[in-house]
Every structure is written in structure tokens, then in C-alpha cells.
Amino acid sequence: NTIDTKGSLGEYFFSVAGNYAHKFYIGASLGIQRINYELTRTHTEVEEDNNIYDFHSFDFTEYEDHSGTGFNFKLGAIYKPVEFLRIGASVQTPTFFKLEYNWYNTMNSNFDDGSSYSASSDIQTFSYRLSTPFRFNSGIALTSQKWGMISFDYERVDYEFMQLKEGDGGVQFTPENDSISMVFGAANNYRVGGELKLGQFYVRGGFALYESPYKSRYDERQSVREIYSGGFGYRENSFFVDFAFSRALWQEKTPIFSTLSDLTTSDFTQNKFIITAGFRF
């Protein structure tokens, strides 16, 4: 079996901001997101012992495509009581998506005489709406023009408020939404990081902890996610370049049968290298 996936999520912002006496800053934005996800799953069988007359192999392929557009609102504020201290908070509404799901299947059969036969299903389309969780963020940072900065951020995400709505044919997704409310809960996420300034060079490090989105009776399915990061950068006049590396570690337990007692454990490690360069003008 082979599974190929690809996708993208882009966002455009329309923002407005202001400040009072360079002590209190406030901003708001409208975000418009465009999402796309494609999946191709192929199952192949080959008859190697020649026990089936005139049959050699077949491929069964499933194609899926999810795409849509959504919008959200963000509101945030920063208070700077003294020059080196910043205290901030923000909220983000759910992102309200209008999505379309397309899928179809193909099957190819190959025979011993070299001939083949192919068949495809009709393309099926289903439209629906999705709202993502509400998010609240707060943070505090100590900054210095001489040595750099240290920051701490807290985020709360209410996964239980995710909802599916208004499917084609009057589908209301009541069982699915009941399952979301039963299985998912609120998660608390924590991030801490620092930047050390060494002339025109910058050294950075950070750590993040993301709680499981599952409620307590289901939280054995996924452990907390830990992310370690580090990097360095260089600044000169209007030019800058940054290098960063992050490693995420987490564990997931997936039911292999219908009961939660039958779980298979998978350990995940995700490494990312990021290089950024640019000019300011």
C-alpha cells in the first residue's frame, strides 16, 4: 500500500493598530484562510504463483481532495509599563470554513497476456462548514537593547467547541459533534524562549509544551508534545539572515480495534530546519 498526501494553508490579513502614549498598544485583524489537502491511497496485489488463470495484478486507488476558504477575527493588546517590560494578551475567534470534499476511485487490472482493464467511479462532491477552536493567548517579555530578550507565552485552546455544520442534503452532523464534545477538551500550551544579542549576531533558544487535546478518559491516545528549538541570526543595516532548528517529540496511541483497550503505540520525532533571509526598506 502507498499513501501520498500534500496540502497547504495560506492566510491573508487586513489589520488596524494604534497606541496610546507609547505605553498601550492595541490591534485587530481580519484573517482570510485558504486550505487545500489532497490524498492518494493505492492498494496493489500481485499474483506471483500463477494459481489464478490469466490474472497478474491489480491496483485500486482512492483519490480525495479537500479545499475551501475561511475567515477569523483577532484582537490583541500590549501594555508596556516600563521600557524593558511588555505584557500582552490576545483572542482569536474560531475560523469559519466553507469546505468542499471531492473523491473518486479507479481500478486497473493486468492480465498474463499483457492486456489490461481500467474502470473509474464518478466524481462525488460534498460541501459542508467547519469551525475551528477558540484561542486565548497571553504573554510577558523582558527586553533589552543591549543583551536581547526573554519571553513566556501561555495559550488555551478549546477543542471541544469545534463543529461541523450544514452539510449537503441537510446533514447536521449531530452524532459527529456529540463525539467531538465527548472526546475533546481544552488544552493549555506553554512556550518559553530567549534571544542573546552579541553585537550583530543573535543566539536563540526555546522550549514549548503542548497538552493533549483529549479529555481525561481519552488522553492515553496522545501524550504531550515537546518542542525544543535553537538558532542564530545576523543583522547588518537593512539585511538579515536567520537559521533555526526545532525538534518535536510526542507519542500517539491508536485503537486497532473498536475498543480503547486495544491500542498500538507510535513514537514520533519531527525535525525542522528553517533559513530566512531578507532586506528591510
Residue ranges with predicted function:
Residues 1-281:
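Outer-membrane beta-barrel porins/channels
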